[in-house]
Amino acid sequence: MRKFILMSATLLAFASSVCAQSVWDRNHLEKVKAQLHRPMYGAAYEALLKNADSLLSVEPLSVMVKKKVAPSGDPHAYLSLARYYHPDPSKADGLPYVNRDGVTNPEINLYDRNRLGETAGRISTLALAWYLNGNEDYAAKATELIDAWFLNPATRMNPNFEYAQMIPGVNDGRGRCYGVIDGYSFIEMLDGIALLEGSKAWTGKQNKQLRKWFGSLLDWMLNSEQGLEEAAQANNHSVAYDTQAIALALYAGRDDVAKKIISDFPEKRMFRQIAPDGRQPHEMRRTLSYHYSHYNLTHFIDIFLMARKLGLKIDDKVSPDGRSFYKAMDFIASYLDKDLDEWPGQQLSGYEGKKQDVARDLWRVAEFIDTTRSDYRDLYQKTRIFNPEDRFTLLYYTPDDVDDAFVSAGNSLRYAISRVNDEKKKEDNASKRRVNPRSVDKDGKMTLVHPHDWVSGFFPGELWMMYEFTNDPYWRQEAVSHTWPIEEAKWHGGTHDLGFMIGGSFGKAWELTGEQSYFDVVRQASETLCTRFHPEVGAIRSWDHNRDRWRYPVIIDNMMNLEMLFKMSESTGDPKFRDVAVSHADVTLRNHFRPDGSSYHVVDYDPSDGSVRMKMTHQGYSDDSFWSRGQGWGLYGYTMCYRFTHDPRYLEHARKIADWFLNIPGMPSDHIPYWDMKVPGVDVADNPDIPRDASAASLIASGLYELAQYSDTEKAADYYYLEALLRKRNLKESKK
């Protein structure tokens, strides 16, 4: 019998905990907890723990801390100031206060509102940290904060908002109906407290007391004059009222109340507050109209999330004349890529920041409410500023391998930036004008290079790619600062590597910003590169050195420089750049490849008649061997050429290289190739004594990913599979 009672109590506690979850999703949090090793979740988790650790020493806040007391004289009475009301400058005493919509009065800090929000946020943080980490110190601190604000007879708040958002000089200092919204932060807090129910610190007695407290607050909201007046509002306040009432009802175990509000919501709120074109007329009148248009829809989304817990779905309801939540969401989402002056209402401040809030809510809808809205997912990915440490990541986001890769890359690049900045200050680097990193040796020594080095554009190119993915201005600023120091390379006619140097740096900057200054550099670099083209050979010369051995060397690497030329013809309409690129690709296709699809590294020509003098290697094991990176240059190069020309010969050849790579003898099981696939020892399975070439693997993975998009289903599956294998292996190595 004792075991039965204990089991029943445990099941009831678990059931009440699940029901009490309102906006947060327990299933999602369980998945997050199991995947904290992933870079994306790990970054947010570490930020959460850092925040939680900082809270362990804070003093609990309570309504007893405020500098002023409600007219009732009871210090336990919650008291807050109407946010947008300020002293009347025309009155000696400033009374009554007057409205300045959208402008917060700093006197708000003298009252309870900010401390309520801060307490709720602290409890949410500590509870989530306990759930994910298991440190009972977090649960104990959260319990201490809950006790001080809600339960301790000496410090607790009365369960009402009778004096919330009062206006000095009006109604004898009594609160207004709008003050009910001050408790909105309780919603997430209660989700956190529901997690705490599994901790040692949070007792069943405290849990019962808190449910009773919030039950009393719910009764006050449902029956008081202020509560009823708030429920009757025609704007975001009534929607926020419904959201709070549903959350309190779920927490207090009064599902009938929650279900009634949810069932009435479409007719009572949605269809009355949203116009057929998606505008919200009451919110559009505000001085922060974009903010409030979204703010109201956030409440909608919270309601839809809570409705799911009760098996109800109302987000898809549409009025006879077309009013719906999705009309409203689509309306504000359509301005995510538009400037403020295009918004049809007034928005005094905070437009860009609010767009980030809109993007996050698009994700919440697509992830938890209507999973068919892939357009919302895409728009979120396109417009959000990537911040792995954002709490949103833990609560709502599901990262993929690309997200994790960019988190790891971001960490590495931030460290690299600090190292580069230190190295550039050293006299030897400064005197030789070394500006960007080339490599770091096994002892951690970083090597910088001059603007004319073939890898000088790699680092700024990576920074521009970080900016492209993250939309974070930090990466743009860093990319700019590491791009312009190599500008002089645009005149460097002694190299074939201008595509590597300028195309990936200035070219990417031009692509992402559209700024003329970047375009001008890329055009000059393209002109300079074309000076190395010999019409008799029909290809761009590679090296100028070793003239005693070579007369006109062309290396397979040069395929990578053609992309800059193709893009320049597309942008200018001048065919000469494309003509050079096509000629070079054709000559290389004719002379560089063996029948099986593998490539020589170097082909030397006689510039007098264009004939082939010799075929050899310079970086591979032997003249007839398979230098892995060279095979990658070819695969990516011809796939890229097909992208610009749609010439089937290029596509066919790219596939030939890919198929050769798929079937080459001696390939390690993870498909990260040895540095050369004909070096002695490749016949030994996964030979640990032969260096691998991760750069070749990355290059091949990029080529395969694009090539798969041009291939039939069966062949694409092979390419995608291998690309994924290579990518995951490289990601795994990057995390070590």
Regions found by a protein language model. Name each.
Residues 248, 289-299, 305-306, 343-371, ...:
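Long, charge-rich low-complexity segments
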Residues 3, 8, 120-128, 147, ...:
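Contiguous, well-ordered alpha-helical segments that form the cores/surfaces of helical PPI scaffolds
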Residues 19-228, 263-266, 308-309, 316-470, ...:
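Extracellular glycan-targeting catalytic surfaces
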Residues 94, 137-140, 144, 153-159, ...:
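Glycan-recognition and catalytic cores of secretory/periplasmic carbohydrate-active enzymes
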Residues 168-173, 230, 279-288, 314, ...:
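Short helix/strand-bridging catalytic loops that position acidic/His residues to coordinate divalent metals
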Residues 1-21:
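Bacterial Sec-dependent N-terminal signal peptides
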Residues 3, 16, 55, 162-164, ...:
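Short, intrinsically disordered/low-complexity patches at protein termini
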Residues 240-320:
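Flexible, glycine-rich surface segments
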